[in-house]
Each structure stands twice: as structure tokens, then as C-alpha cells.
Amino acid sequence: MIAGLRCLSRCLWTLILFTGHLQASTTRTYYLAAEDVLWDYAPSYPVNPMHGKAFSEDEQIFVEGNKKDRIGHQYYKARYVEYTDASFTRIKPRGLEWEHLGLLGPVIRAEVGDTLKVTLKNKTRDMPVSLHPHGLFYLKNSEGTHYEDGTSGKDKADDAIAPGESHTYTWQVPERSGPGPRDTDSIVWLYHSHVDEVRDTNAGLIGPILISRKGQLARNGKPRGVDKEFVVLFSVFDENESHYLEKNINAFAPEALSQQQDDEFRESNLMHTMNGYVYHNLKGLTMTVGERVRWYQLALGTEVDLHTPHWHGNTLEESGRRVDVLNLLPGTHVTVDMQPDNPGQWMYHCHVNDHIRAGMMANYTVLPQKSR
């Protein structure tokens, strides 16, 4: 009897403490929609910005369509878009600081101890979607993953959101979701659709979650002591494994309907991207000498998505080590800091040779300090 009362007492105190924690935390609300888009991997076509000349014959494999059996540089895809409220009538402007996100969904930001409530509306035409976060704490009704897990009813409502429907996901940000002892004061996680993870992510439904230590977010929304933030996803989007493959073939390469297993056709649909752009088409990576710059690096994909981001001209700090190249595996997240001291326009790319040739390259710009 006494042991039972002690157990009940402990349970009640745990509930009280947990409830108090939730009441004291900040709840951050986001409204995201999954939408069909026509995406351009190379808006500069027919010019390669790397050298200012026409794309070479080898480069054209990935960017030149012929209305017959090559789709080209434009593909129908899906994308997460942020709205201002639950009416989903007004898109929230992204702002110049996030211009570089490209195909990625909006930044979802929180501090340790916060609660995130993210309402997802499916505005695609015929594709079930979801939201699944890496690193955060969630119950079964907010996992956003479609598989047989022994649940039913409301606990399955999050698994697959049908076109025209919506669902609100609730995620907690406990201490174990935030930066570790050797991390920077903010780190990055991924969120993505997980109904059919391979087809969903190749379609484009991916975005970043930025988590800061408790009390580290300044009024401007950035982590304290950080002037610029850049989020970059290195990923080989396999358009052969996208929900939109047949739509893209019908729209841009109708003769390829009978060639979907052709090796050359399949190779042409492997888009080696940084935030959904190839061959130096990624824009917005601009900073000034002396600024404190935080880079959030992500990777997702298959066994070919072994990436080694390399910054020319400047170095970075990773967990106390000085580096200019990182290692990324599919599904991993790395956060590093840079304080550039070398002005100029510098190459920033994956150092895997095959990926370089296929266009996984960009530039970042370091402006000189203004003289006083």
C-alpha cells in the first residue's frame, strides 16, 4: 500500500513538473503547405555561370532538353511553402537573407525547451504528404511517417495528408534535441515528407530545422553572436524516383515514355544540386570580411550522396578543428562557423570529382569591409 502511494506520488510530481515545463516554454507556430511547382535547376541556361560560356556537351546531359527523350533543366516538383496563418491565403515573404534556400522549405526555428506547432496543408494535386522531423521529440500523432506501427485512429492521422486536407504536428525540443557540449550554439536538423520517403524527397519536400541553446536567440531571430546564416543541402535529386516522373516525361520528353529504363535517360535525370541548383546557379551566399557566419550543411539521398563540401579562399571551425572541407553522409547534419578574412568571389562545391562534373558547384562572395 505504502509503496503504491509512493509510486503514485512520484507520478503526480512528474506530471506536475512536465506540465510546468510546457507552460513556461515558448510555443512557436508555423503554417506550411506542400505545393506543386515547376522548378528550374539551371535558370542561367544556356550559359554556365562558372565560365560564362555555353554549357559543354558533357554538361548538356543534365540541362538540355530536346522535346523527345531528354527532359532538360525544368522539372515539375513539390515544395514546402510558408504561409502567414491558418487560412493559407497569403504566402509569408522569404526575405533576401533566405534567398539561397532555393528549393528547400522554410526555416523552422526554436530554442531548447520550446514547443513547435506546425500545420501542414496539402495543396498538391494528387500526392499524399507528411512532415517528419529529425532530432525532435514527438508522440505517435506527430511522427509524420507512414508504416505499420500498431497505432490507429488519431495516431494515424499524421501519416499521410491527402490533397486538400491538413494536419497540425506538435514537436517538443528537449535538451537532447539541442546543441551538444562541443557544438555551436545552434545546430541544424532536417524535416521532410515520409509517406513514401524516396519519392517524396526526390520530389523536393525537404527543409531545415534550426535549434539554439536556451536563451541564445536574439530579437532579430538569429543566434547571439552570429551575423549571417546559410543552410545548404547537398543532394543528387533522382528524378527517376520522383512522384512527378511521368508528368515530366509527358510535358517535356514524350518519346521517353518507352525509355524509362534506358541508362542514358536515367543518368540525365540525376540532378547534382546545392539547394536545388546546378552549375553555379545558387545565389545569395554573400557576406563581409569579419562577419560571424554560420553554415548549416545537410545531405540526403542514396549511396552516391557522399559529399565533401569545400570552401575556397577561407577556413571554418568544426568542433574546435580548423577545416575547409567537411564530410557528409545521407541524412547527416553538420554546423560550422566561418569568420572570413579573404575578400573575393570563391568557389564552394562538393569535392567528389563526378559530382563536380555533374554541376554540384556554387560561388560564395566575401565583400571587403567598408572603410570608416
List each language-model region with its residue ranges.
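Bacterial N-terminal signal peptides
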Residues: 9-20
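Copper-binding active sites and cupredoxin-like electron-transfer domains
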Residues: 24-372
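N-terminal secretory signal peptides that target proteins for export/translocation
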Residues: 1-7
